[in-house]
From Swiss-Prot:
Species: Pectobacterium carotovorum subsp. carotovorum (strain PC1)
EC primary class: hydrolase
Major subcellular location class: cytoplasm
Keyword Nucleus: no
Cofactor(s) required, per the database record: Zn(2+)
Name of this protein: Mlc titration factor A
Residues annotated for Zn(2+) binding in this entry: H111, H148, H152, E211
HAMAP family: MtfA
């Protein structure tokens, strides 16, 4: 077995004080003190294992790097840092970026052209982000660019390609697919009825099962009450896979005497 020099089997415990400014965002406010400590330890490991590469003259300050690492670590809080082994680099643009892409239309014709992207997750390569929308991921709105791309990487770990079914026990796959496709069908019906702009959730979820898993993972962590209300069975599937219960965490925080959403700066 090869031992990579940057992998530390005994991660150092990071002090919350050093990460206090970075962790003070609404998305992470519901975490308990124990979860916060675990999260910053994972985030520190992340920064030691991955290269953050700013593009187009973007300057990544320490707090920017810490917040990127914290958001990458949140979905794997219980899965562990090894769940993020599928990449070594994170490329960060200042804003949405243009890429040359191929796509197939409804009748099978292949087209090539320039497309604006928010982020990308290559099957055997880096994750690409844009800082503008990373900043939009700090709240509890249901949108989270980093969690979306992490979900794709977790999906790919299962079979080598993104199918919408991450690494779960074989006995759970049929139920998972049933609820995932059920959510896609329900969202498509809603879109057909009220249109994409008025839909209750991001219409990109109906694109394919892989995108549905990624989009609804965003809601699982940043708007769990909406996912649980719309698709409670799927929420429980996600809860079992991620080994977290963001809704219970959110309710506990909201009922606490210290309930106060932090300001983002």
């Amino acid at each position: 077995m090869i031992k990579w020099p940057w992998k530390n089997s005994q991660p150092q415990v990071q002090t919350l004080e050093h990460w206090q400014a970075a962790i003070s965002i609404p998305l992470l406010a519901p975490l308990s003190d124990e979860e916060r400590q675990k999260l910053v330890t994972l985030a520190d490991q992340f920064l030691k294992q991955k290269r953050l590469i700013p593009l187009q003259e973007l300057v990544l300050t320490e707090i920017m790097q810490q917040r990127i690492a914290l958001l990458f670590s949140l979905p794997v809080l219980s899965l562990g840092i090894d769940a993020l082994d599928g990449f070594h680099e994170v490329l960060v643009y200042p804003g949405p970026f243009i890429v040359e892409e191929e796509w197939q239309d409804d009748i099978g014709l292949v087209h090539t052209g320039k497309m604006v992207q928010s982020g990308q997750s290559w099957d055997q390569g880096p994750i690409v982000l844009n800082w503008q929308e990373v900043q939009d991921s700090f709240d509890l709105s249901g949108f989270n660019l980093i969690i979306h791309e992490v979900a794709h990487k977790l999906d790919i770990r299962s079979s080598g390609e993104a199918t919408g079914v991450p690494l779960i026990p074989l006995r759970d796959i049929a139920v998972w697919e049933q609820h995932l496709h059920g959510a896609m069908d329900a969202l498509q019906e809603e879109i057909d009825l009220v249109g994409e702009e008025a839909a209750s959730m991001d219409p990109y979820a109906v694109h394919d099962p892989a995108e549905c898993f990624a989009v609804l993972s965003e809601y699982f962590f940043s708007a769990p009450e909406l996912l649980d209300e719309r698709f409670p069975d799927l929420y429980r599937c996600f809860q079992k896979f991620y080994r977290q219960d963001p809704l219970a965490r959110l309710k506990s925080w909201q009922s606490s005497v210290n309930y106060r959403a932090p300001s983002i700066y």
